[in-house]
A protein has these predicted regions:
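Conserved Class I SAM-dependent methyltransferase catalytic core
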Residues: 3, 109-165, 170
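Conserved SAM-binding strand-loop segment of SAM-dependent methyltransferases
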Residues: 60-70
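Conserved SAM-binding motif I beta-strand of class I
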Residues: 42-47
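Conserved SAM-binding loop of SAM-dependent methyltransferases across substrates and taxa
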Residues: 27-40
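SAM/dcSAM-binding transferase cores
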Residues: 164-208
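Conserved class I S-adenosyl-L-methionine
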Residues: 18-26
Length: 208
């Protein structure tokens, strides 16, 4: 299974749940991590790429080839956790491989569609957890507010203490409370260039 830092971070960081949807599941990494963390949960993954779905199934994930826009279109409020490591190369050159292009560009699933359909599928007390480029934080928070989803936990991720944040991990719910909002940071590398203690602790269940 291909393992990427973003997926590992989200899979280790996301809230728990009993019914979970992984949007853009790819190889199934995040779904598998949540299956390990929440062994009693029903975890499903969807992806538009047929090869990715096949790989996720090989990795033990209950995966389906589907667009989020069409997923359970006749049923709402059915998940208590939705997670996604969404496509973010919005301004980069398109990948000549069409499958990978669709998987990594917001043309196939824009941020607003992701938020809108997640809001439709979440239970009243459900949560949406995303990992994004740090520069997308304001945009995604503004979009989420339009659909009555508000941040409950924000972790800004830095490769090194001396560098700007490179990723942000956010959890949203329908509860709008600035008082209860948790904001923290995670530095991935220590001063020697190795994995930081905080990163190791977050992911200790998954890394040898």
């Amino acid at each position: 299974m291909k393992v990427g830092t973003d997926g590992v971070l989200l899979g280790a960081w996301a809230p728990s749940g009993s019914r979970i949807l992984d949007v853009g599941t790819g190889s199934g990494l995040i779904a598998r991590m949540l299956m390990q963390r929440c062994p009693e949960a029903e975890v499903e993954g969807i992806d538009i790429d047929e090869a990715a779905v096949a790989q996720a199934k090989e990795n033990g994930v209950r995966a389906f080839q589907a667009r989020l826009q069409d997923w359970k279109s006749d049923i709402g409020n059915c998940y208590d956790l939705i997670v996604s490591n969404p496509p973010y190369f919005q301004n980069s050159l398109k990948n000549p491989d069409r499958g990978r292009e669709l998987a990594r560009h917001t043309d196939s699933l824009g941020y607003e569609e992701l938020i809108a359909h997640s809001a439709r599928l979440l239970k009243e007390e459900g949560q949406l957890a995303l990992i994004l480029p740090a520069e997308a934080e304001e945009e995604i928070r503004n979009l989420a507010a339009r659909y009555s989803l508000f941040p409950t936990h924000i972790t800004r991720v830095y490769s090194k203490e001396t560098k700007p944040a490179r990723r942000v991990i956010l959890a949203f719910s329908r509860k709008n409370s600035i008082v209860d909002l948790i904001e923290d940071s995670l530095v991935l590398e220590d001063e020697k260039g190795g994995r930081s203690a905080a990163y190791s602790k977050l992911c200790e269940e998954f890394y040898l």
